[in-house]
Amino acid sequence: MVEVRGGWWRLAAIVVLAAGCARRPAPPLAGPSSAPVLETPARVSLIAAPVESDWKGLGDEATALLSQYLRINTTNPPGNEIAAARWLAEVLRREGIEARIFEPAPGKANLYARLAGDGSARPIVLLNHMDVVLASPEFWTVDPFAGLVKDGYVWGRGALDMKGEGIAQLMTMLILKRANVPLKRDIIFLATADEEIGAGVGAAWIAEQQPDLVRAAEFLLNEGGLTRAKTGGQGAVEFYGVGTTEKSPFWLDVTARGTAGHGSRPTADNPVHRLIRALNRVSEWKTPLIVTPAVERSFRDLATIERDTTVRRWLSDIRAAVRDSAAVRGLTSDLTYNALLRNTISITGLKGSNKTNVIPPVATAVIDVRLLPGQDPAAFLAEIVRVIGDTAVTVKPQGPNWSATESSTETEMFRAITAVARRQHPQALVTTLMLAGFTDSHYFRRMGIASYGLGPFPLTQADSRGVHGNDERLSVDALRAGVRFYFEVVSRVAAK
């Protein structure tokens, strides 16, 4: 069997599957301060759009701002995003940009700011989240909330996910304002709470309670992309992956019922046995392979840089590959390829009796289903009930679910991303990504806003291991490149 390496997809999974995976125990608010005093970094004055000589200073300014931002401990839970929102509001106010802070729950805040254009084209939303996942200081070589700048890196929890990208978006706002760039579109800066937990008080709250803030927007930029830097390539970029869609979660509760009793007297309809049989059928079920447009495009593009000739052939024509048994075995043996080609099912929890000698009347399991774009949750539910084939076992969705949608590549924004990427790195590939996880972009795609995941910072595989991991850090060079990338994309689409 051909070994499918799939290293770039594994990296993408590390970067983007982290969404919604925070550990549950609430940590203490360690770190220098939950509300640090704003320090004024060296500020680059502009009378027009930046020229080459300006970018070193703008990168230094971004580094100083990110260092400060990382000192605000927004570990979720509890989040304490109000402190981050107040800090961002002060940075914006200092530049003459007013911001509104919404606090849908105590300590949980969302910040909204807008640069006005002439209204001849629809707005662009720059979306980022302020919360971060738990950092265990005993496993770090630096204080995760000190915002330390050392050895050419800015260190701290959130540097990659996603305070670094938030600073790139913030700097885009500041540069546009400072340089008095005439705009045809409003630029909306939206920093939200709660992305790592999903308790409904962040992007979901904006979409449901304040939709008029963003309803008119044509485009949204968020996390969920990847810029792959060549290892040892001195800043050379191998490819840009732009997130155009993502799988949707469809979490299910499976419940089996039977006759309770004493463990010493087995019953014929023990619900635990019934549940095990049902779950065995589910685990053995091979869901159909489905090729979505985003995956077909990305596989075809990435085939051009795939070194393994067999895998290259599969990726270059994935529709033919999924009809070939050898290709199917090879592709589905790789966890990431498998996740991108089918609806997936993971059994993640079981519960029966809390006593060894008691047969319970009910046994339950939880299943994490991820559906491809275009798949109907109700139809999938009916199919999994058919597979189980036991009327004493019920399957119910845990909560709200949705069908994932895909943002078109035939837009001014996608063309701008491609043009800027190719101007900065002419040899780099630009392609689409579908995330096996999900981001807050789905709230806005469902509002009809074309939403794209950017990974503006050129990262090697080693760099990306810090996402939700120990010693998370972002290089100063990558930060500078990301600020420039964001500004050039946004100004290309929004400037007159």
Task: Give the residues covered by each predicted segment.
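Acidic/His- and Gly-rich active-site-bordering loop/insert found
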Residues: 24-29, 36-157, 176-185, 367
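A common structural junction motif
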Residues: 130-131, 282-287, 385-393
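A short core secondary-structure module
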Residues: 200, 204-206, 259, 264-286
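An extended, acidic, His-containing surface patch that forms the Zn2+-binding/catalytic region
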Residues: 119-121, 228-230, 288-357, 361-362, ...
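Short amphipathic alpha-helices in soluble, non-transmembrane regions
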Residues: 269, 380-388
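Bacterial N-terminal signal peptides that target proteins for export
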Residues: 1-12
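Acidic/histidine-rich catalytic neighborhood of metal-dependent amide-processing enzymes
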Residues: 153-154, 160-241
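C-terminal motif of bacterial Sec signal peptides marking the signal peptidase cleavage site
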Residues: 18-20
